[in-house]
């Protein structure tokens, strides 16, 4: 996989992650924090897990060791969560821009949270992060439907269409 393809995937996942936050931002704080029996509790827990995972993988790619999980309590509301996520994305974007194209195929050695050593090419780990977010956006959509909230589509084809429209507007 080429660096530009991975960059495109990362751009898409940022768009989709922020898009899924739109309906969440319309909820009450109680709805945002409610434990709904999902794998990470509810909306806040699932979104906090996504932010934590994005940060964890970025740290691994930079050669850092595992750290403690982000506590979902750090996010009293959607705004705090979005702000933290945006900061993580900015750091990831700056790191990614600094990569040489050949580096995406190089192996990354990292440790899982249980201390086991692993190794995989960087491009596979970036693909994993994008896929991981897609999986949890599906869970968020289900949780939103469970409480009767509006949902949004986060399909890549929609992102592609919107990008083409924006490009045409810039052209003229």
Language model regions located:
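Short, contiguous alpha-helical
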Residues: 7-71, 112-172
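Helix-adjacent hinge/juxtasegments
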Residues: 64-105
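Short acidic-hydrophobic surface loop/beta-edge motif
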Residues: 108-110
């Amino acid at each position: 996989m080429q660096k530009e393809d991975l960059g495109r995937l990362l751009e898409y996942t940022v768009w989709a992650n922020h898009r899924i936050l739109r309906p969440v931002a319309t909820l009450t704080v109680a709805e945002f924090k409610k434990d709904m029996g999902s794998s990470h509790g509810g909306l806040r827990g699932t979104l906090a897990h996504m932010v934590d995972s994005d940060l964890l993988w970025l740290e691994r790619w930079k050669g850092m060791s595992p750290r403690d999980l982000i506590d979902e309590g750090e996010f009293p509301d959607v705004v705090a969560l979005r702000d933290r996520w945006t900061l993580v994305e900015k750091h990831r974007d700056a790191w990614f821009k600094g990569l040489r194209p050949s580096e995406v195929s190089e192996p990354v050695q990292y440790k899982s949270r249980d201390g086991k050593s692993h190794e995989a090419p960087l491009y596979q780990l970036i693909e994993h992060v994008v896929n991981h977010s897609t999986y949890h956006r599906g869970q968020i959509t289900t949780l939103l439907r469970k409480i009767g909230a509006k949902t949004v589509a986060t399909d890549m084809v929609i992102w592609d269409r919107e990008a083409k429209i924006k490009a045409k507007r810039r052209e003229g």
